Amino acid sequence: MTEKNQQEKMAAERQVELFTKAFEKAKENNGIWLANDGRKAPALYQKHLQVSAFNAIVLGMHAAQNGYKTNQYTLFSEAKKRGESVQSKEKGVPFLWYNWNEYVNKHNPEDKISRADYQALPSNRQADYKGIRSREVRALFNIEQTTLPMVDKTAYEATVQEHGRLSDRNDVECASTAIRQGVENLLDKARENMVEIRSDSTGVAHYDSKKDIIFLPKASSYEHYEDYARDAVSLLVTATGHGQRLAREGMIIKNGKASAEDSIKQERLITEVATAVKLQELGISAKLSPESMVMTDYWARELKENPCLIDILERDVNNAVDMLHKAERGEKVELNSKT
């Protein structure tokens, strides 16, 4: 992987710090490592920009660990434009921003052009070029870290009512109903476009990778609906790693042998994080499974000692959640014939 600059290294350290704190919190909180409490998914305040899955989990952990009412974030420059400022001694959270401002000829690496020049080319010429991705690290601040609550109390309170924790909102019943509808819609779309889902009478939720089938008990068999949702989302994420979908290393069985133990533990980390992202979109807190709880120290150590792991996590979590989004949009997720 490309060598990180100092800013990227500092961002990675901050991300690892947030994950480590979250895993430690899980030990004290019956496995809950991302207490979402009904907050809507992370977003940039007053901006209609898509937030990647990995950025979303980083922002979500930051909001949860600091007890913020919403997952609404802003740039320092944007706050300034609105007549606000970041409060003193507040520490931002890293947001990974990708640009494709330069393009290179697929047949001649010396031939590079700007984005504007690329867009001016006819479509048949554009096919000869591919984008060069560059990464920037931006610092974001939760709106509670700014002076918004004081400068424009009305706007702040309206934002909390629309995006905040259930305990801070007036429409609790409607919000709770929306959460259930979100889960059922996800399952319907996934069943229709990605993977077969069957009811399981044994009471044990599981994914059969050989048959590519999810077996899920009825919601009524769970004491808490949130646990049903967690099992459902976790199994959907697991299914994205199938050898004929994203083919994550920890999911692949070669010559009848399972992946190495480290790969299996890494797959478990990817599954838990991607599951948390999707649950966060639904407004549900993420809870580690008992099997995952025993891996938290290993994950924390590996994230700290292996600088490449945070990048692998970003890539695989983004890919898994993007695949679920594709199914939700009504696009078919076909199995790849090549394994």
Predicted feature descriptions by range:
Residues 1-339:
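N-terminal accessory/interface modules of nucleic-acid-binding and processing proteins
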